[in-house]
């Protein structure tokens, strides 16, 4: 048999009984089909199986052809930052809530995976953003798949900032914060803030002021080729940045924040019968009333 993928990694964080049964069933199913399987270390320890190959997420990224992520979108976000460094392809089994990134249903995951492992899939290269903090010419860098959020440390406290696009001043804003989102992140926090939904492969970035103090402030969609720079008012004391929902870190009024497209991509794969608008309709409840009337 000619395998599309030879070595498959299984990754996940939650180790409750329900999750463990999914890990166990998936592992045994792949082994019976003749694949080499690498279990992430914590899964291997929890399953306590004999003669298993285990490793870190980095090991899986380096050695495997495909990683199967079991969890929610949060799990995928955490893992994306590591696996985007490798040519490995990624697919997710959703045991979380919405599951925009982990789109396989646990109940039908094996049958869908069987279809995919026979070559019936396509790849989406989801770009990441670089978030660069500059202070006294010293740079620190983070990578995000969904969004970066700049906000005050104090609840309901506005911040003042200037936004430059390609080093040209674009606008000044007083707001609770600012969201910079990728197309992948357009169905996450950006959506809750009133941002548009973008097709995943659009080469674009969303800029959304959060609760702006101004009647004419609107979300912007710009080319992902552009560089975004944020400068803060000298009046502002307490600022933080959150990257993909992780614990915020402090920034200061004399810091500059530069955000631009990374050279890294998450290589996400889907079944050939996957359709993004079907996902939006199901996840967001579009057209429910319409279909009820027809019935």
Swiss-Prot record:
Binding positions (NAD(+)): 73-74, 78, 146-147, 157, 174, 176, 187-192
**Keywords recorded for this protein, A-Z:** ATP-binding, Cytoplasm, Kinase, NAD, NADP, Nucleotide-binding, Transferase
Under Enzyme Commission nomenclature, its number is 2.7.1.23
Q: Which cofactor does it need?
A: a divalent metal cation
Q: Which GO terms describe its biological process?
A: NAD metabolic process; NADP biosynthetic process
Transmembrane regions listed in the UniProt entry: none
The function of this protein is: Involved in the regulation of the intracellular balance of NAD and NADP, and is a key enzyme in the biosynthesis of NADP. Catalyzes specifically the phosphorylation on 2'-hydroxyl of the adenosine moiety of NAD to yield NADP.
Q: Which PANTHER family match?
A: NAD KINASE (PTHR20275:SF0)
Protein's name in the database = NAD kinase
Source organism phylogeny: Bacteria, Pseudomonadati, Pseudomonadota, Gammaproteobacteria, Enterobacterales
